[in-house]
Amino acid sequence: MIQGVIFDMDGLMFDTERIWNICWEPALAKFGLPCKDGLPQAARGTTKAGSCDVLRRFYGEDCPAMGIVEELYRLAYEAFNKPVPKMPGLDELLAWLDEHHIPMAVASSSPMTVIEGHLEHWGLGHYFKAVISGEHLTRSKPAPDIFLLAAQKLGTEPAKTMVLEDSYNGVRAGAAGGFVTVMVPDLSPATDEMRRIYTCECASLLEVRRKLEDGEL
């Protein structure tokens, strides 16, 4: 039986990944750079520092990585001033876990102000025993550090804790930490690599709830 559940946020709880995707092109254009194929996907699920590493990999060590990332975040923050929709099944899954007294945490690479803003807007903060941002951790996803810290705060063992993720880097992090890693794809479809390392794939959070109800997870 699962003893705890850790939620990623962007693209898993809220429909924010499309906003991040849209913001990459103008952020890069400000510095005279095109948006290369695969860049948004490679940076998905990482912190500011992780996104800088990805930019240097795509454009070279001399690219103004931090300037681009700061512009990316500025544009995204502007967009986040409007309500961002919840992903299908979020309310139902949270209610089921709460009813069954399974502790929950949010572990997101986004800054804490962004995480708290989304949770407060939808009135969901009370569900979570811990809310963790990766902005102050040394290692970003795909390292498992943020999930290990979340499990520690929940008081659960990784092998009995579910990680819900939509990004490749997040699935890699969950698998690396020894978690029950469930991929709920948003913009990134499951690949052969993901299928090798995740526990299972669900089409939505509604399916996650169904599998829990049926004892499949």
What do these predicted regions represent?
Residues 13, 86, 104-107, 139, ...:
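Conserved SAM-binding loop
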Residues 19, 43-47, 72, 85-89, ...:
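Short beta->alpha linker loops
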Residues 20-24, 28, 48-55, 69-80, ...:
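Hydrophobic alpha-helical core bundles mediating ligand binding, dimerization, or RNAP-core interactions
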Residues 27-60, 65:
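Alpha-helical substrate-recognition element adjacent to the catalytic core
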Residues 34, 103, 180:
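Residue-level detector of anion-binding/catalytic polar loops
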Residues 1-3, 95-98, 111-217:
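Asp-based, Mg2+/Mn2+-dependent phosphohydrolase catalytic module
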Residues 34, 54-95, 100:
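Metal-dependent phosphoesterase signature
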Residues 1-41:
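Active-site neighborhood of HAD-like aspartate-dependent phosphohydrolases
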